[in-house]
Amino acid sequence: MKTKIFSLANEEVGEISLNEDIFAVEFIRDDIIKQVIDWQRAKAMSGNHKTKTVSEVLGTTKKPFKQKGTGNARQGSLRSVQMRGGGVAHGPRVRSHATKLPKKVRKLGLIHALSEKCAEGKLLVIDSLKLDKPKTSALVNILNKFQGKSFFVIDGNEVDINFSLAAKNIYNTVIVPQIGANVYDIIRHEYVLLSQEAVSVLEERLR
């Protein structure tokens, strides 16, 4: 499958042949894409939520009032779950939310996400992702030429330091090396920009 190569000025500078098994899958599996996104989001959760149980909450274990004769329901401790300031029953505990997902499914998710963006016309191949200076204003002007609201930029094995620094302060713009390409960021950003080096490395990695 042939597609155009653009410069950072959004001008056509050539053509490149893309592997159809990676960038032009015929049937997009949304279920696989969702599986991989759920796996990513669960893995990213900190899991540090926690409430105190009866044994952990600060306070006395003294009986609040005598067993009989007050007309109240019997109580055994001021730290019980039904008392104000008491412990919490069955509350959240510190734990990992990470789940397991086979590597083949993760690989398929990336292939189908790239194919979906390509089918939408929102995946663009750029000849070079290098800037002379780390100027945010200059990069904003460049990205405005593509008329997109958000950009996920994938470079080769290494990211140009000037491009990376310039992109840091731009809302909804992320740049990563090819190893950082992931389904969640590909789907949530409007445009995916790939350098020519990224295309060749991704094709080798996902073959």
UniProtKB/Swiss-Prot annotation:
UniProtKB keywords: Ribonucleoprotein, Ribosomal protein, RNA-binding, rRNA-binding
Biological-process GO terms, alphabetical: translation
GO cellular component: ribonucleoprotein complex; ribosome
SUPFAM superfamilies: Ribosomal protein L4
Record Pfam families: Ribosomal_L4 (PF00573)
Database matches in InterPro entries: Ribosomal_uL4, Ribosomal_uL4-like, Ribosomal_uL4_dom_sf
Top-level taxon in the UniProt lineage: Bacteria
GO molecular function, one term: structural constituent of ribosome
Known role: One of the primary rRNA binding proteins, this protein initially binds near the 5'-end of the 23S rRNA. It is important during the early stages of 50S assembly. It makes multiple contacts with different domains of the 23S rRNA in the assembled 50S subunit and ribosome. Forms part of the polypeptide exit tunnel.
UniProt cross-references to NCBIfam families, sorted A to Z: rplD_bact
Assembly information from the UniProt record: Part of the 50S ribosomal subunit.
PANTHER family for this protein: 50S RIBOSOMAL PROTEIN L4, LARGE RIBOSOMAL SUBUNIT PROTEIN UL4M
Assigned protein family: Belongs to the universal ribosomal protein uL4 family.
Protein name per the record: Large ribosomal subunit protein uL4
Species of the source: Rickettsia africae (strain ESF-5)
Record gene name: rplD
